[in-house]
Amino acid sequence: MKAEEKNMIDIVKFGAVGDGVTLNTEKIQAAIDAAAETGETVCVPGGVFRTGTLNLHGVSLHLEAGAVLKASEDLNDYPPQDYVHNELGVLHAMLVNLGHDNVTIDGSGTIDLSGKSFYDTSVKNVPESRVPFTQAQIDECTYPIGTRPSQCIFFHNSKNITLRGIRVIDAPCWTLSFNECENVKVIGLTIDTDRNVPNDDGIHFCSCKGVIVSDCNISSGDDCIAISGITNWGKPCEDIVITNCVLRSCSKAIVIGYIYSHIRNVTISNCIIKESNRGLCFMCNDEGALVENVRVSNMIIDTAIRAGNWWGNGEPIFMMAVKHDYHIPE
């Protein structure tokens, strides 16, 4: 759909250049700020539009066919945001939406996160072993971790968020993060990251409520879909539906729980998991953790042990549990 056919603002009219070289952060942000005033959607037309951090402020994005929103390869283009993650520290992201509702990112275009530009891809992090690795095993190992944007597409404290139809590729770290969000829909996405990049998880839901993930194809160097309470241990992650997805992970295709997390009311159905170090993983690895009311049905799980420092040993289903005592950390 062209910008003129709907209530949309075309970033080109604000001076953005889709040549794959020009840094368009200020131009695209100006379009977003204008749309925040009018209630319109920002349209990314065909072309490769390079950008640093963009703050959505509740504005929706539409990516037309042939559109590529390409993340800058320069860390200086990702200034620190007003958010500190419990595990990943100060937020440096490409797309940020903090505390704004009713955001949709859709279309048939691509978000290219330029992940490999933050790694030396000529080197592999081969663990010490008494048995020498074959070249095939070395090829499966991670790149050494470097400095990189931490969470590429980041939503916090937001309601009514929909991502539909787009393609997201080459993340340097977590691809999509939803923290303390409500009514989230991720439908028909393709997420394709380099399988040698450590921590380039597909989707993280942290302390969220009311989530639907359907008809997605996710290939990642770490977890494809992770459900936890890592950003707010005292708030449960609940009412989650995952269905009709194809998942391929060097770590865990789907992981439920982590340290103190409280997870409840999760259904997983009609998914294919293949070439994964672990299929389904349940982690209640602290006395304060709780996972309850989870139903899994109609799954095909095909695992394969991958060399290197990945989590897992080819288990289709893995459970880590300790006795729950209802303690929640301060």
Identify the function of each model-found stretch:
Residues M1-E330:
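Extracellular/periplasmic carbohydrate-active domains that bind, remodel
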